[in-house]
Protein backbone atom coordinates (compact mmCIF):
# COMPACT_ATOMS: atom_id res chain seq x y z
CA UNK A 1 0.00 0.00 0.00
CA UNK A 2 2.73 2.59 0.80
CA UNK A 3 4.24 2.17 -2.69
CA UNK A 4 0.82 2.77 -4.29
CA UNK A 5 0.28 5.88 -2.16
CA UNK A 6 3.74 7.17 -3.07
CA UNK A 7 2.99 6.65 -6.74
CA UNK A 8 -0.29 8.56 -6.44
CA UNK A 9 1.46 11.42 -4.65
CA UNK A 10 4.07 11.61 -7.40
CA UNK A 11 1.38 11.72 -10.09
CA UNK A 12 -0.45 14.48 -8.23
CA UNK A 13 2.80 16.43 -7.87
CA UNK A 14 3.51 16.09 -11.58
CA UNK A 15 0.09 17.49 -12.48
CA UNK A 16 0.80 20.52 -10.27
CA UNK A 17 4.16 21.13 -11.92
CA UNK A 18 6.06 20.11 -8.78
CA UNK A 19 9.50 18.65 -9.48
CA UNK A 20 11.78 16.72 -7.10
CA UNK A 21 14.94 15.55 -8.85
CA UNK A 22 15.78 12.65 -6.52
CA UNK A 23 13.32 11.31 -3.95
CA UNK A 24 16.05 9.11 -2.45
CA UNK A 25 17.71 12.26 -1.07
CA UNK A 26 14.76 12.88 1.26
CA UNK A 27 15.09 11.15 4.64
CA UNK A 28 12.30 8.86 5.82
CA UNK A 29 11.12 11.26 8.54
CA UNK A 30 11.20 14.37 6.34
CA UNK A 31 7.76 15.59 5.26
CA UNK A 32 7.34 18.13 2.44
CA UNK A 33 4.31 20.28 1.63
CA UNK A 34 4.94 21.82 -1.79
CA UNK A 35 2.79 24.26 -3.76
CA UNK A 36 2.41 24.30 -7.53
CA UNK A 37 5.47 24.73 -9.75
CA UNK A 38 7.94 24.43 -6.86
CA UNK A 39 11.15 22.54 -7.64
CA UNK A 40 13.89 20.80 -5.68
CA UNK A 41 17.11 19.87 -7.45
CA UNK A 42 19.53 17.20 -6.24
CA UNK A 43 19.21 18.37 -2.62
CA UNK A 44 19.63 16.44 0.64
CA UNK A 45 16.58 16.91 2.88
CA UNK A 46 17.07 15.83 6.49
CA UNK A 47 14.46 17.46 8.70
CA UNK A 48 14.81 16.72 12.43
CA UNK A 49 11.17 15.86 13.19
CA UNK A 50 8.48 14.05 11.22
CA UNK A 51 5.72 16.21 12.75
CA UNK A 52 7.34 19.46 11.56
CA UNK A 53 7.13 19.46 7.74
CA UNK A 54 8.86 21.82 5.34
CA UNK A 55 6.46 24.05 3.42
CA UNK A 56 7.68 25.28 0.03
CA UNK A 57 5.76 27.99 -1.81
CA UNK A 58 4.66 28.17 -5.42
CA UNK A 59 7.20 28.99 -8.16
CA UNK A 60 10.17 28.60 -5.82
CA UNK A 61 13.18 26.49 -6.69
CA UNK A 62 16.39 25.23 -5.09
CA UNK A 63 19.22 24.04 -7.31
CA UNK A 64 21.44 21.00 -6.79
CA UNK A 65 24.14 20.27 -4.25
CA UNK A 66 22.49 21.81 -1.19
CA UNK A 67 21.09 20.63 2.11
CA UNK A 68 17.84 21.37 3.92
CA UNK A 69 18.21 20.72 7.64
CA UNK A 70 16.42 22.77 10.34
CA UNK A 71 14.07 24.65 8.00
CA UNK A 72 10.31 25.09 8.30
CA UNK A 73 9.36 27.16 5.26
CA UNK A 74 10.39 28.61 1.91
CA UNK A 75 8.02 31.28 0.62
CA UNK A 76 6.75 31.79 -2.91
CA UNK A 77 8.88 32.92 -5.87
CA UNK A 78 12.20 32.16 -4.14
CA UNK A 79 15.37 31.54 -6.15
CA UNK A 80 17.93 29.40 -4.31
CA UNK A 81 21.27 28.59 -5.93
CA UNK A 82 23.64 25.63 -5.89
CA UNK A 83 25.36 24.21 -2.80
CA UNK A 84 23.19 26.17 -0.36
CA UNK A 85 22.72 24.89 3.20
CA UNK A 86 19.49 25.99 4.88
CA UNK A 87 19.04 25.61 8.64
CA UNK A 88 22.55 24.54 9.61
CA UNK A 89 22.57 23.70 13.36
CA UNK A 90 25.26 25.36 15.45
CA UNK A 91 25.31 22.63 18.09
CA UNK A 92 25.16 19.32 16.24
CA UNK A 93 28.33 18.16 18.03
CA UNK A 94 28.91 18.38 21.83
CA UNK A 95 31.81 20.81 22.21
CA UNK A 96 31.57 20.83 26.03
CA UNK A 97 31.74 17.02 26.35
CA UNK A 98 35.01 15.09 26.63
CA UNK A 99 34.89 14.41 22.89
CA UNK A 100 32.97 16.09 20.08
CA UNK A 101 33.05 12.83 18.09
CA UNK A 102 29.68 11.15 17.73
CA UNK A 103 31.48 7.79 17.80
CA UNK A 104 31.79 8.11 21.59
CA UNK A 105 29.20 10.82 22.29
CA UNK A 106 26.25 9.19 20.57
CA UNK A 107 23.87 10.02 23.42
CA UNK A 108 24.15 13.75 22.63
CA UNK A 109 21.06 15.43 21.20
CA UNK A 110 21.32 18.77 19.42
CA UNK A 111 18.80 21.53 19.96
CA UNK A 112 16.03 22.05 17.43
CA UNK A 113 15.38 25.59 16.23
CA UNK A 114 14.08 26.27 12.74
CA UNK A 115 14.94 28.78 10.04
CA UNK A 116 12.45 30.28 7.61
CA UNK A 117 12.74 31.93 4.21
CA UNK A 118 10.20 34.59 3.20
CA UNK A 119 8.67 35.24 -0.21
CA UNK A 120 10.65 36.41 -3.26
CA UNK A 121 14.03 35.76 -1.64
CA UNK A 122 17.12 35.27 -3.80
CA UNK A 123 19.89 33.17 -2.24
CA UNK A 124 23.02 32.87 -4.39
CA UNK A 125 25.38 29.88 -4.66
CA UNK A 126 27.29 28.46 -1.66
CA UNK A 127 25.35 30.30 1.04
CA UNK A 128 24.90 28.90 4.56
CA UNK A 129 21.87 29.99 6.59
CA UNK A 130 22.24 28.98 10.23
CA UNK A 131 19.42 27.33 12.18
CA UNK A 132 17.00 29.77 13.79
CA UNK A 133 17.60 32.56 11.25
CA UNK A 134 14.56 34.24 9.68
CA UNK A 135 15.06 35.77 6.24
CA UNK A 136 12.45 38.38 5.36
CA UNK A 137 10.50 38.82 2.13
CA UNK A 138 12.41 40.20 -0.84
CA UNK A 139 15.86 39.78 0.73
CA UNK A 140 18.95 39.01 -1.36
CA UNK A 141 21.81 36.91 0.05
CA UNK A 142 25.10 37.20 -1.88
CA UNK A 143 27.30 34.30 -2.94
CA UNK A 144 29.31 32.51 -0.21
CA UNK A 145 27.60 34.41 2.63
CA UNK A 146 27.12 32.82 6.05
CA UNK A 147 23.93 34.20 7.57
CA UNK A 148 23.93 34.10 11.37
CA UNK A 149 21.30 36.75 12.18
CA UNK A 150 17.76 37.54 11.04
CA UNK A 151 17.47 39.52 7.81
CA UNK A 152 14.80 42.21 7.48
CA UNK A 153 12.65 42.38 4.31
CA UNK A 154 14.31 43.65 1.11
CA UNK A 155 17.81 43.85 2.57
CA UNK A 156 20.95 42.76 0.69
CA UNK A 157 23.38 40.66 2.75
CA UNK A 158 26.94 39.63 1.83
CA UNK A 159 30.02 38.21 3.55
CA UNK A 160 31.02 35.87 6.37
CA UNK A 161 29.47 36.59 8.76
CA UNK A 162 26.71 38.07 6.63
CA UNK A 163 26.17 41.82 6.91
CA UNK A 164 23.57 44.12 5.39
CA UNK A 165 25.10 46.37 2.71
CA UNK A 166 21.96 48.20 1.64
CA UNK A 167 18.23 47.95 1.08
CA UNK A 168 16.82 47.16 -2.34
CA UNK A 169 14.29 49.98 -2.18
CA UNK A 170 13.30 53.01 -0.11
CA UNK A 171 11.51 52.48 3.20
CA UNK A 172 8.25 53.71 1.67
CA UNK A 173 8.55 51.34 -1.27
CA UNK A 174 9.33 48.40 1.02
CA UNK A 175 6.29 49.13 3.19
CA UNK A 176 4.08 49.30 0.08
CA UNK A 177 5.50 46.07 -1.35
CA UNK A 178 4.89 44.27 1.93
CA UNK A 179 1.32 45.55 2.05
CA UNK A 180 0.70 44.49 -1.54
CA UNK A 181 1.53 40.82 -0.84
CA UNK A 182 1.86 40.47 -4.62
CA UNK A 183 3.06 36.87 -4.24
CA UNK A 184 -0.51 35.91 -3.30
CA UNK A 185 -1.97 37.28 -6.55
CA UNK A 186 -3.05 34.75 -9.17
CA UNK A 187 -0.13 33.97 -11.47
CA UNK A 188 -2.12 34.73 -14.62
CA UNK A 189 -2.68 38.29 -13.37
CA UNK A 190 0.93 38.70 -12.25
CA UNK A 191 2.27 38.18 -15.77
CA UNK A 192 0.71 41.47 -16.91
CA UNK A 193 2.17 43.61 -14.10
CA UNK A 194 5.19 45.94 -14.68
CA UNK A 195 7.84 44.17 -12.59
CA UNK A 196 10.61 46.30 -14.10
CA UNK A 197 9.44 49.52 -12.39
CA UNK A 198 8.61 49.39 -8.67
CA UNK A 199 6.78 52.74 -8.60
CA UNK A 200 4.56 51.88 -11.55
CA UNK A 201 3.98 48.41 -10.08
CA UNK A 202 2.75 49.90 -6.80
CA UNK A 203 0.25 52.30 -8.38
Where are these predicted regions, by residue range?
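Extended, small-residue-rich solenoid/repeat segments and analogous flexible loops
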Residues: 1-43, 105
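Short, T/G/N/S-enriched strand-turn elements that build extracellular solenoid repeat scaffolds
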Residues: 29-32, 54, 73-74, 151
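Flexible, glycine/small-residue-enriched loop-and-beta-strand segment within the central core
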Residues: 22-23, 39-131, 168
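Glycine-centered loop/turn positions within well-structured domains
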Residues: 149, 153-155, 163
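Beta-rich strand-turn-strand
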Residues: 126-139, 145-149
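Catalytic-loop signature of eukaryotic-like protein kinases
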Residues: 120, 138, 155
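Conserved G/P- and acidic residue-centered "switch" motifs that form tight phosphate/ATP-binding loops
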Residues: 141, 159
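C-terminal segments of enzyme domains that contribute to small-molecule binding surfaces
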Residues: 3, 99-130, 161-203
Amino acid sequence: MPSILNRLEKLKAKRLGIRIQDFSNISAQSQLVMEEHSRLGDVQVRLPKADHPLRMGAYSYMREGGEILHLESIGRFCSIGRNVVLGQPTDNHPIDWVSSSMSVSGAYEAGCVYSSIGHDVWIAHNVVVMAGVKIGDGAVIGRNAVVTKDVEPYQIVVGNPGKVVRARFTTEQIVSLMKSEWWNIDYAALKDLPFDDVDVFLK
